[in-house]
Amino acid sequence: MKVIFLADVKGKGKKGEIKEVPTGYAQNFLIKKNLAKEATSQSIGELKGKQKAEEKAQAEILAEAQAVKAVLDEDKTRVQFQEKVGPDGRTFGSITAKKISEELQKQFGVKVDKRHIVLDHPIRAIGLIEVPVKLHKEVTAEIKLAITEA
């Protein structure tokens, strides 16, 4: 019996796959537990439509990420921070991914999720710093930060 998997089933198939499985296994286990449904011509058409819509959505997300990357990679896109600095040359407050995200929104109108900004630890130094941003699994940009003494 041909079935369309609605969820990943270890050793049998992944979500969205169409596979031939034993009839008893399909009826008594997969279909009963909503892990799969029978592959009729109508359900196959629905699946193809969903896959096309998903691909289109992924393409839009990728295009949006590339547009944001183009803005961030421009030389004039430099996020300005003014921080108080102690005698040892370190800032009193640290610059976190959240702060960087908020300043990008405020200064350039570019919305970047703070979870996409790759910081090993908060920035406490002054000067010019480049921070990588993972906008999409295929798109990575660099944010230029100019941290000056207040």
UniProtKB/Swiss-Prot annotation:
<dbReference type="InterPro" id="IPR036791">
    <property type="entry name" value="Ribosomal_bL9_C_sf"/>
</dbReference>
<dbReference type="GO" id="GO:0006412">
    <property type="term" value="P:translation"/>
</dbReference>
<protein>
    <recommendedName>
        <fullName>Large ribosomal subunit protein bL9</fullName>
    </recommendedName>
</protein>
<dbReference type="InterPro" id="IPR036935">
    <property type="entry name" value="Ribosomal_bL9_N_sf"/>
</dbReference>
<dbReference type="InterPro" id="IPR020070">
    <property type="entry name" value="Ribosomal_bL9_N"/>
</dbReference>
<dbReference type="InterPro" id="IPR020594">
    <property type="entry name" value="Ribosomal_bL9_bac/chp"/>
</dbReference>
<dbReference type="GO" id="GO:1990904">
    <property type="term" value="C:ribonucleoprotein complex"/>
</dbReference>
<keyword id="KW-0694">RNA-binding</keyword>
<comment type="function">
    <text>Binds to the 23S rRNA.</text>
</comment>
<dbReference type="Pfam" id="PF03948">
    <property type="entry name" value="Ribosomal_L9_C"/>
</dbReference>
<keyword id="KW-0687">Ribonucleoprotein</keyword>
<dbReference type="Pfam" id="PF01281">
    <property type="entry name" value="Ribosomal_L9_N"/>
</dbReference>
<dbReference type="InterPro" id="IPR009027">
    <property type="entry name" value="Ribosomal_bL9/RNase_H1_N"/>
</dbReference>
<dbReference type="InterPro" id="IPR020069">
    <property type="entry name" value="Ribosomal_bL9_C"/>
</dbReference>
<comment type="similarity">
    <text>Belongs to the bacterial ribosomal protein bL9 family.</text>
</comment>
<dbReference type="GO" id="GO:0019843">
    <property type="term" value="F:rRNA binding"/>
</dbReference>
<keyword id="KW-0689">Ribosomal protein</keyword>
<dbReference type="GO" id="GO:0003735">
    <property type="term" value="F:structural constituent of ribosome"/>
</dbReference>
<dbReference type="InterPro" id="IPR000244">
    <property type="entry name" value="Ribosomal_bL9"/>
</dbReference>
<dbReference type="GO" id="GO:0005840">
    <property type="term" value="C:ribosome"/>
</dbReference>
<keyword id="KW-0699">rRNA-binding</keyword>
